């Protein structure tokens, strides 16, 4: 799942990425990051790129590509742009957006819209079983309940949150609520086992509890990610059984002793 942004090369960027992934045999779900930061013309072009690619992916029968309607974050997207994205979103896909990654995102939403971020997304029709929210650091229990009610997905990006000094999300509570949660990177690393390790120690440190995260982190990586992908691809993923997709990686194992 890639949330791409390159504001000097919007048109056809998702198609270029998908072709490279195809050459490598990698299954991909792509979207372009819509934002008002570079003006309305660029925002509109971003919406159109998402729509074009999503329709192309929906018509493809290889089960190797999928598309979403990508958005940057609440504080960089006006109601006008939200409405434009919703009007051009094909049926059968959802949104991919950063949510409450920084406290500024929450403050902006409260000041300009008089509501918290998840409430705004709910009112704009963004939430749902096909929508993926990144981060969710500054959300409260009421917002978690909305995510559960709408069956919206969440992805935790521990190294990105630490590197950007954003804070630690209430991921253990989110998982406890039964919200489908995956483990990601936000582009900070390409090593998922490193993300696994960092997520494990981050929540132990943050909660001052050495028993925290032992079950939740492997659940996110080995079960949550496959279930998230399963909402966009037809074949069974994340399992070793007859008929399932053979999405297998083989890693070197360095023995601790000679």
What are these regions (language model features)?
Residues 1-7:
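Hydrophobic alpha-helical hairpins/lids featuring a short glycine-rich hinge
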Residues 34-35, 101, 158-163, 186-188:
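Short, acidic/turn-prone active-site loops that include or flank metal/cofactor-
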Residues 140-142, 146-184:
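A conserved active-site cap/scaffold subdomain adjacent to cofactor or substrate pockets
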């Amino acid at each position: 799942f890639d949330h791409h942004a390159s504001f000097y090369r919007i048109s056809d960027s998702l198609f270029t990425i998908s072709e490279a992934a195809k050459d490598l045999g990698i299954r991909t779900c792509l979207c372009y990051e819509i934002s008002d930061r570079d003006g309305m013309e660029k925002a509109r072009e971003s919406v159109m790129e998402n729509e074009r690619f999503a329709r192309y992916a929906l018509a493809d029968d290889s089960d190797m590509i999928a598309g979403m309607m990508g958005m940057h974050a609440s504080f960089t997207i006006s109601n006008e742009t939200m409405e434009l994205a919703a009007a051009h979103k094909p049926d059968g896909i959802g949104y991919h957006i950063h949510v409450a990654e920084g406290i500024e995102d929450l403050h902006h939403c409260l000041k300009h819209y008089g509501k918290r971020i998840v409430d705004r997304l709910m009112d704009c029709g963004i939430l749902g079983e096909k929508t993926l929210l990144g981060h969710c650091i500054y959300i409260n229990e009421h917002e978690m309940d909305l995510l559960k009610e709408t069956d919206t997905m969440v992805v935790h990006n521990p190294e990105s949150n630490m590197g950007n000094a954003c804070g630690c999300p209430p991921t253990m509570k989110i998982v406890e609520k039964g919200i489908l949660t995956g483990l990601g990177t936000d582009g900070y690393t390409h090593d998922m086992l490193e993300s696994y390790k960092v997520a494990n120690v981050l929540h132990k440190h943050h909660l001052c509890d050495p028993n925290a995260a032992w079950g939740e982190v492997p659940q996110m990586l080995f079960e949550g990610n496959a279930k998230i992908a399963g909402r966009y691809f037809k074949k069974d993923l994340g399992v070793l059984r007859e008929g399932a997709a053979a999405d297998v990686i083989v890693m070197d194992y360095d023995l601790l002793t000679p």
